[in-house]
Amino acid sequence: MKILLLAGNTIRSNSYAQYLVSNSFKIEGLFYGFHEIEYEAPQLNYETKHFFIKSDLMLPDLEMGIEKVFDNHGRKYHHVEEHDVNSKNIINQIQAMGPDLVIFSGYGGQILKKEHFDLNIPYLHMHPGDIPSEKGSTTIYYSILNRKSCTVTAFLMNEKIDAGDIISKRIYCPPTRNVNIDQYYDNIIRANCLIDALNAISQKRDIVSFPLKDKSLEYYIIHPVLKNLSILSLDNL
């Protein structure tokens, strides 16, 4: 299976790349917007490091840029000097590369348009919520408040937001107090679920379609007070 990582210059893309090469997946990269967005490695504090050691989840070296990750493991990548993921240049490049599967890891707020799906190539996305019941933004914090756990859903995208055929779901223990949720926890649990999803695809596990009558709630960017309450609800390490 020929896998393409369609990636912006983000911590999530870097996390995906390191999980993919660590699990020996043969991938190519199509990197876009790197000329506009500079990568900044996040600080790693004690609580974050020890949480992932205790959880037995691989902690990527986010000091290393994604290009270095690809170079070190002999993976090919191409750059497109476009920030708009829906640009004709990017879509034409994807078509020319001819992947069997695209892993989408774009910039925040970007939504793929119809032209991507007209390529008839499946696009895989990892959503930090229990689809179809938890859609939208900052669902991790709502999950912590509502159920004291976090789910990642891997699904094949379509033109609807946070909708498509479900490939895999993984439930994770919530982070402990002072773990870096936005930069480490969110991206690492998504990367971990990505590997499970690719294994599911290769093993031809059953795909679950979304219910026709979707009664899910749409979550929007969480209010700072609610976000703080969810953080305060976390246990100490």
Functional labels for PLM-detected ranges:
Residues 1-237:
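One-carbon transfer enzymes
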